[in-house]
Amino acid sequence: MDSNFIFGIIAFTALVLVLAVIILFAKSKLVDSGDITISINNDPEKGITLPAGGKLLGALASKGIFVSSACGGGGSCGQCKVQVKSGGGEILPTELSHISKKEAKEGWRLACQVNVKSSMDVELPEEIFGVKKWECTVISNDNKATFIKELKLQIPEGEEVPFRAGGYIQIEADPHTVNYKDFDIPKEYHEDWDKFNLWRYVSKVDEHIIRAYSMASYPEEKGIIMLNVRIATPPPRNPDVPPGQMSSYIWSLKPGDKVTISGPFGEFFAKETDNEMVFIGGGAGMAPMRSHIFDQLKRLKSKRKMSFWYGARSKREIFYQEDFDQLAAENDNFVWHVALSDALPEDNWTGYTGFIHNVLYENYLKNHEAPEDCEYYMCGPPVMNAAVIGMLKSLGVEDENILLDDFGG
């Protein structure tokens, strides 16, 4: 055998061995061996010890500390912000769309993107330590509109979810397959389902997923959690887009099924002032509106002036009408209005028509003495939210009086 060939093999093998030694040495320096410690809020009782590896979001969850992450750790929702004081390494490009330069300088990171390589020091909001997980039972899952179901969950006996009105929970789902043809939908809602042949869709999920949903229930509705879930069907102009994974899963649930939730989370809370409250909602954005209004009038017995403006396509898309009619009859300080954007001939609708932001402006805010002094609570489709915010800005309403829930629409 040629001596040069043999020498080449020996040299190549030696190079590989040297590189392997360098990598192992670097790893030993960059990653702690054995267990590492995560100091939390500079409180020895809150700190955790665990093996190095994985992401900070998962490390905290493994010790029962659940940080909100509607996307399940994919880095797309930006909810899992925590402050890493030391040990988190450099901020990653995947985080920069959710974290400003100022926040980055202050150590803010996305927990789902921070590698647990060594001991670190983090700051977490105190309310996170009240977050728990529960295995709930489906009580009912009924259509309230063409594309919206009301999911009602039973909390385990002896347990309670200590949430505030306007808060949200996260739902988990294991890998699954959902056939839309198996959905239980009343015939009164079949028109659009037949028109776009939505029954043909199948949602196949190969991984564990987590999503966030605002609660429609309010704190005095003990033992239950109630959600309004709009199914995310592919848009008519792009029918090949996969349907929404979690909404498809939720729509497939039946009474008696078990569902894992975690919470409570939230920041869309009512201000403790005497200012007038104006609620604006559309679609599944009804959920936090119901929670807030019921809480103000039923639990707090609030005397603040308040109105609710809800936008729907047609009469069949209005829900909780009897509940709000009753609240208006029982409370002189509350009124509510519905505007239909696409009323059907059979609706015989004589109420407001058009988009809700225009209706609110033309029929109330245009002649309001001081619209800038009101507090505005809104939740609905992104287009509605943007239109309402633009209208409020034109009236001189400051950001601090515009409160938006991004989940319910």
From Swiss-Prot:
It is found in: Cell inner membrane. One of its GO terms (cellular component) is plasma membrane. Binds 1 [2Fe-2S] cluster. The chain crosses the membrane at residues 5-25. GO terms for biological process: sodium ion transport. Its EC number is 7.2.1.1. [2Fe-2S] cluster binds at C71, C77, C80, C112. One of its GO terms (molecular function) is oxidoreductase activity, acting on NAD(P)H, quinone or similar compound as acceptor. Residues 34-128 form the 2Fe-2S ferredoxin-type domain. Residues 131-271 form the FAD-binding FR-type domain. Keywords: 2Fe-2S, Cell inner membrane, Cell membrane, FAD, Flavoprotein, Ion transport, Iron, Iron-sulfur, Membrane, Metal-binding, NAD, Sodium, Sodium transport, Translocase, Transmembrane, Transmembrane helix, Transport, Ubiquinone. It is a single-pass membrane protein. Its cofactor is [2Fe-2S] cluster; FAD. Its main location: membrane. It holds the Pfam family FAD_binding_6. It catalyses: a ubiquinone + n Na(+)(in) + NADH + H(+) = a ubiquinol + n Na(+)(out) + NAD(+). It comes from the Bacteria. Belongs to the NqrF family. Composed of six subunits; NqrA, NqrB, NqrC, NqrD, NqrE and NqrF. NQR complex catalyzes the reduction of ubiquinone-1 to ubiquinol by two successive reactions, coupled with the transport of Na(+) ions from the cytoplasm to the periplasm. The first step is catalyzed by NqrF, which accepts electrons from NADH and reduces ubiquinone-1 to ubisemiquinone by a one-electron transfer pathway. This is Na(+)-translocating NADH-quinone reductase subunit F. It comes from Actinobacillus pleuropneumoniae serotype 5b (strain L20).
